[in-house]
Amino acid sequence: MLVKTFCAAVNGLDVNTVTCEVSMSRGVQFHLTGLADTAVKESYDRIKAALINNGFKMPTMDITINLSPADIKKEGSGYDLPLAIGILAANGKVEDGNLDKYMLVGELGLDGHLQPIRGALPIAIRARKEKFKGLIVPQQNIREAAVVNNLEVYGMETLLDVIHFLNGTTTYQPTIIDTRKEFYEQQNHFDLDFSDVKGQESVKRALEVAAAGGHNLIMIGPPGSGKSMLAKRLPSILPPLSLAESLETTQIHSVAGKISRDTSLISQRPFRAPHHTISQVALVGGGNNPQPGEISLAHNGVLFLDEMPELPRSVLEVLRQPLEDRKISISRAKYSVEYPCSFMLVASMNPCPCGYYGDPTHNCVCTPGQIQRYMNKISGPLLDRIDIHCEIQAVPFSELSQMQPGEPSATIRERVIAARKIQEERFKSFKGIHCNAMMSEKMLHEFAEPDAASMDMLRMAMERLKLSARAYSRILKVARTIADLAGSEKVESMHIAEAIGYRNLDRGDWAERGI
């Protein structure tokens, strides 16, 4: 007897429907074909134990299972459930009349309980696209899978629940969650606020400009000056996620297994802050079973690299291409996947190894050679891709104790959203362009062309600071954002002047340190 069940194979963010063909004949052997990895091949032992522990006997017959299409690699333990149901149906224990209506995914515990799988959301999207009536997933994955409309999604606790449902002996209702309502309710709830930070108004302004235009930013200052504190509050002034952005972000986190049981759609922009010991693979993605890295988990959000020069230079250099292309292609001998990675890079660093170069309250103990080697850890090409360089100084306690609370994030966010709306209107006819940081060279001439006085100022800065052509483009993009925040249609000299001021690492004694 031949029985077919349906499941899915996840490759990057792409999902392929997989047909599990189960055939039984005389004999006692078990055959599994279809480019299955080790975890899938081990499913026989899990299925056998689960069946026995739930009152079933493993058929004493020759079982042949083919996972079609056979040229797509099948990875992970999510095939346990469709394989088990296929074996039971071929043995007459499960009615096969409904098997073509549902997609099944789930890992089996030895006691028959269903364990969560990765990629439930993109699998649900695929099931709807293939016009399946419903999707059966482990209960732990129900909230993310139920995000998809026009698809009946059932969360099951055990193998027996699935058997009773397919046989019609027990009635289950599909899970319906008002995910959109939850999404909008949770968008504006932040634990951290800019009003917590006293002083540092110039840095807050730089962060506001960065948020308004989607610009990359680096903060340079001594220990304890508030670099990390300010960076962690950046998401509170970023514009809210759209539903489309949230869906894409949630899919990436779903594939990576980062979605908790209580989460449906990710409602706030991601903030990822990996440790400086991170490897290349962990940062950009990859591995034997390809997984998204930190740059993809930060998609539509912020990637914060604290103490940036402490990261190995080889790790930092892999950021250059993703920062330009806003996507990462990972190619290995056995696979090739692509993940989106449109993120804001926010970095912090000390001015020298001891941290106190230029600090009026501490003496720097570093030699010029040590300072130069420290600064050279960040290459010029990478630094060119960072639009805003912001110097930060520690606030003296005498001033700190007398200052009033700063401007709240909600007020700053209103200005950022207003600037982003101007940019959305400007770029509405350009596919994939949402903010000023994404502008091409051609678009700069159209939307950020400075007047004669501004061009003279910019030419002088280029010559004196020895700026690259890429730095020139970054200045124009930042100036366009500053003009948007001011509600100005044209880029004026005051906007250019402020943008040039955000090239701290290209100026004066900074440049002499070796960058």
Q: For the regions a protein language model found, what residue spans apply to each?
A:
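The Walker A (P-loop) glycine that initiates the GxxxxGKT/S ATP-binding motif of P-loop NTPases
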Residues: 221, 285, 307
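Conserved alpha-helical scaffold flanking the Walker A/P-loop in AAA+ ATPase domains
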Residues: 208, 265, 270, 280-303, ...
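Walker B catalytic acidic pair
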Residues: 300, 306-307, 318
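Peripheral, non-AAA+ core regions of ATP-driven protein-machinery
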Residues: 1-218, 222-228, 331, 471-472, ...
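Short beta-strand elements
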Residues: 18-24, 283, 387-390
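Basic, amphipathic alpha-helical bundle interface domains used for macromolecular binding and assembly
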Residues: 33, 39-44, 59, 66-76, ...
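Residues immediately C-terminal
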Residues: 110, 303-304, 310-311
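Walker A/P-loop
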Residues: 219-260
